[in-house]
Amino acid sequence: MIDSSLPLTDIHRHLDGNIRAQTILDLGREFNIALPATTLDTLRPHVQVTSLEPDLVSFLAKLDWGVKVLASLEACRRVAYENVEDAARNGLHYVELRFSPRYMAMTHRLPVDGVVEAVIAGVQEGCRDFQVDARLIGILSRTFGEAACQEELAALLAHREGITALDLAGDELGFPGTLFRNHFNQARDAGWHITVHAGEAAGPESIWQAIRELGAERIGHGVKAVEDPALMDYLAEHRIGIESCLTSNVQTSTVASLAQHPLKQFLEHGVLASLNTDDPAVQGVDIIHEYTVAAPAAGLSREQIRQAQINGLTLAFLGEQEKAALIQRVAKG
């Protein structure tokens, strides 16, 4: 189902949600951190979804184990580097890795600024070694509140040349986007692109807020957009992208099943929607699974899957010359 003549992208992929089980085991041993299991096989059910039944609480608990072992800046550099290696192994030509430096720093009270620097270094090394084009998106974890997000933003801005865009993630219901207008004004002043998690837990009004108040060019998940016909029209007309994550949305109970996922509706409506993974190490999937298993199960035709692949490049936070160069590189094999 993947068109090998086109670049394969993943533009919604959490770096801190893609920490290998083996790495969690290694770092746990290195720093004498108590883990729920002591071998890879017994650890895996604690850090990766192994049940078909959606369970948000369990999903989040598995996600947290990855950052609980980040006890040094070198550990942060390592997982960033391995994220690029994983992208190369998955056959990705271009990947946007998003991360919350505060989330990565909090368990062991690492310097947030140092985490940003370590992640940038790891990704740059990975791009050099594995010939993958990767960009970084900084996340503000709104669950920590406005003041903490300003500190997180300051750490990202201190290394602005290594960051491509800003995202807002976390408790969408308790911390609406309007609280973070000033933060995103600063991001736009820095020349960054804007993408926002919205319409995942909250309704269409959260997506409108992300667009009108934060300047979102893309929306993460955005499944609730289908509840508002005017919003669907607006997304299509203004070419605001939807970063769809099929398997993730089922595992977190955002949608009831793949068959009920709105990605097909987005594509039929002319919305620029793309296929992405989200937290692949936790989900136990890769981008190939999303194209060959999840997308057909969501009702997408072969042509719609190809369109989603095209949309991934269209929506990428790259200049037109960079996109053209990527297309040419893939064509040459």
UniProtKB/Swiss-Prot annotation:
UniProt-listed InterPro entries: A/AMP_deam_AS, A_deaminase, A_deaminase_dom, Ado/ade_deaminase, Metal_Hydrolase
Q: Which GO terms describe its biological process?
A: adenosine catabolic process; hypoxanthine salvage; inosine biosynthetic process; nucleotide metabolic process; purine ribonucleoside monophosphate biosynthetic process
Where does this protein hold Zn(2+)? H12, H14, H197, D278
Q: What is its EC number?
A: 3.5.4.4
GO MF annotation list: 2'-deoxyadenosine deaminase activity; adenosine deaminase activity; zinc ion binding
Q: Which cofactor does it need?
A: Zn(2+)
Function field: Catalyzes the hydrolytic deamination of adenosine and 2-deoxyadenosine.
Q: Which family does it belong to?
A: Belongs to the metallo-dependent hydrolases superfamily. Adenosine and AMP deaminases family. Adenosine deaminase subfamily.
Protein name stated in the entry: Adenosine deaminase
Species whose genome carries this gene: Klebsiella pneumoniae subsp. pneumoniae (strain ATCC 700721 / MGH 78578)
This chain is encoded by the gene named add
